[in-house]
Every structure is written in C-alpha cells, then in structure tokens.
Amino acid sequence: MGAAASIQTTVNTLSERISSKLEQEANASAQTKCDIEIGNFYIRQNHGCNLTVKNMCSADADAQLDAVLSAATETYSGLTPEQKAYVPAMFTAALNIQTSVNTVVRDFENYVKQTCNSSAVVDNKLKIQNVIIDECYGAPGSPTNLEFINTGSSKGNCAIKALMQLTTKATTQIAPRQVAGTGVQFYMIVIGVIILAALFMYYAKRMLFTSTNDKIKLILANKENVHWTTYMDTFFRTSPMVIATTDIQN
C-alpha cells in the first residue's frame, strides 16, 4: 500500500470510517454496553506496533457487518493506483485469497460474508474473546498505531479482524523494504565518500608531495624539444677565423 507513512494514514482513515459507519448504519455507540469484550490481543511477532481497543457496540450484528464492509470499500477507493497495486498480494498473504485490483472489493466482501456468517463465528457465545495477529512492523523511526474496534458481536469483530490482518500484513511487506532501502542508501553514500576522498588524496599527493624522480620527469617533459637543425644554425651563425700561413711561420 505504498510507503509506510501511507500505511499509517490508511489505518487512521479506515478506523475513522468504521466508527462512522457503525454509528450511522448500525446505531453503534461507545456508550453502549458490549455483549462481547476483548480480553487479550496478541501479536506473535511485534516489531514496533502499538494497539488500542475501542468499543463501538450495537445489537445489530448484520448491520455491523455491512458497515465494516462499506468502510473498507470507501477506504480502498481512496487509495492511489500505486497503493492499490499492493493490495492483491496482501490478500493472498493474509487471507489466502487470489484476487486482482479490479475484483478485490467483491472478493473481500464474499470472504467476509462467508467467514463471518459461518456457524463457527455465529455460535461463538464467549463473552470475552481474544484476538491473535501473526506479525506487525512499525515504520523506520516510528511505530505503527493500530486500533481494533470492538463491535460487541462475533460477526462484526470477525470482519474487523479480517481488515486488521490485511493492515498488519501490509506493514510486514513495506517496512522491512524501507529498512533495507535505507541500509543500501547508507552504504552507497559511504562508498561515494571513500571514492571522493581517495581522488582528493591522489591529486593532493601529486601537487604537494612530488618525488625527485617525478620532478626530473616533469622538468624533462616541460623542456623544449630542440630540432637537430637548430644546432647547425648555432654552429654556423659565427664566421670561422682564418689564420694565414705566414702568421704561423712567423
């Protein structure tokens, strides 16, 4: 679902819409006595996630289910194309559902209605229920804050749990990539600094610390290359002195 920061934004938006839909469509309220309480919430592998439980209970379990699905649909519709592209993989990993960007809403609705209307869920009369999530990751430098909304019914809580499984699965896919990406960027920066430092030292040595052999080479390289005809010109530039034989005899 895009960057890890977008996950937190999506979580917040989803929670707000669920609360609003439950209030509007299922007459839920934070003051209503809940028939079911959340006893414990387990995250088997928690890597930086915080959790709070919020009660929004009512007596209409079917309306709760519809409200949760409506909130999920609206939230998905508000995602960017890049974020939507992540969702099918999240469905497969979290709920074992094969889906696509175009059918994800319908497939999720079918999954929730089949699962949450099953006898195993409907006949669960436990007044205190526990919720178990496999794993959750926080974004680099900041935790992911989750909110489980207790609807007060097994049906409603079943739908909420399905959404939370998707959300936490998204954190396991995005946050580790960001950590890995941060590490790669760090090493690339370090390597770049080392290369620049090596180049600086090389040129500094050439400029400030020149050996005797290098100095000789530089002098010879800068010395003018004199052509052989120049030496002949120099030799014949002054007329030779003529000595008479009489002078020698005397």
UniProtKB/Swiss-Prot annotation:
Q: Which residues lie on this side of the membrane: Virion surface?
A: 2-183
Tell me the organism's taxonomic lineage. Answer: Viruses, Varidnaviria, Bamfordvirae, Nucleocytoviricota, Pokkesviricetes
- Alphabetized UniProt keyword annotations: Disulfide bond, Host-virus interaction, Late protein, Lipoprotein, Membrane, Myristate, Transmembrane, Transmembrane helix, Viral attachment to host cell, Viral envelope protein, Viral penetration into host cytoplasm, Virion, Virus entry into host cell
- Disulphide-bonded residues: C34-C57, C49-C136, C116-C158
Q: Which residues lie on this side of the membrane: Intravirion?
A: 205-250
PTM comment text: Myristoylated.
GO biological-process terms attached to the record: symbiont entry into host cell; virion attachment to host cell
Protein's membrane topology: Single-pass membrane protein
Q: Where is the lipid attached (N-myristoyl glycine)?
A: G2
Which locations, inside or outside the cell, does it occupy? Virion membrane
Quaternary form?
Component of the entry fusion complex (EFC) composed of OPG053, OPG076, OPG086, OPG094, OPG095, OPG099, OPG107, OPG143, OPG104, OPG147 and OPG155. Except for OPG095 and OPG053, each of the EFC proteins is required for assembly or stability of the complex.
Which chain regions cross the lipid bilayer? 184-204
Q: What is this protein called?
A: Entry-fusion complex associated protein OPG095
Family per similarity comment:
Belongs to the orthopoxvirus OPG095 family.
- For region Targeting to MV membrane, the annotated ranges are 2-12
Expression is induced as follows: Expressed in the late phase of the viral replicative cycle.
What the protein does comes down to: Component of the entry fusion complex (EFC), which consists of 11 proteins. During cell infection, this complex mediates entry of the virion core into the host cytoplasm by a two-step mechanism consisting of lipid mixing of the viral and cellular membranes and subsequent pore formation.
Q: Which organism is it from?
A: Variola virus (isolate Human/India/Ind3/1967) (VARV)
What Gene Ontology terms describe where this protein resides (cellular component)?
Answer: membrane; viral envelope; virion membrane
